[in-house]
């Protein structure tokens, strides 16, 4: 949770160390493949380009946050008034995998990151919205679900 005044819930999606390490390894392998046979300054170019791109990509993905503020659920890519939400379900890793994969509905709104294994599924009860549910990645499904069930109060 964060320190935002008026926020009933706040969670940052900071990438864990293994994501940073994986990004560096992928960038190094790709750069090594591209620089094969190059000499001099041309051998350095793939590393100088791919390493910063990989790190900036992870940094950008880590900027996501879930917030419940002033009766509104805010996630990367969307926001919805809590009044339009119905049932709330906490999902463990296996349930999250199923809802993101074989049981996914095409119209569902999904906001998560690869390193967030758990999630909260929230039914949408807005008559003007054909989205059946929101799937929100979180490290603390119980805490987020409790806030959503209490409608952010």
Predicted region positions:
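Non-transmembrane, membrane-adjacent beta-strand/coil modules in membrane-associated proteins
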Residues: 76-135
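Short, aromatic-rich membrane-interface segments at the entry and exit
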Residues: 38-47
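Hydrophobic, well-ordered secondary-structure segments
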Residues: 5, 25-28, 48, 121-125, ...
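Cytosol-/stroma-facing membrane-proximal "stalk/adaptor" domains immediately downstream
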Residues: 137-153
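Pocket-edge structural micro-motifs
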Residues: 11-13, 124, 138
């Amino acid at each position: 949770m964060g320190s935002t005044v008026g926020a009933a819930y706040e969670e940052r999606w900071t990438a864990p160390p293994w994501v940073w390490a994986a990004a560096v390894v992928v960038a190094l392998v790709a750069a090594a493949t591209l620089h094969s046979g190059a000499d001099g300054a041309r051998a350095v170019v793939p590393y100088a380009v791919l390493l910063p791109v990989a790190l900036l990509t992870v940094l950008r993905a880590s900027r996501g946050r879930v917030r419940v503020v002033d009766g509104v659920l805010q996630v990367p890519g969307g926001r919805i008034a809590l009044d339009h939400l119905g049932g709330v379900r906490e999902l463990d890793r296996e349930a999250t995998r199923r809802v993101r994969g074989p049981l996914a509905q095409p119209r569902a709104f999904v906001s998560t990151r690869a390193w967030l294994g758990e999630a909260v599924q929230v039914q949408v009860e807005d008559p003007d919205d054909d989205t059946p549910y929101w799937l929100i990645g979180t490290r603390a499904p119980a805490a987020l679900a409790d806030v959503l069930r209490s409608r952010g109060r």
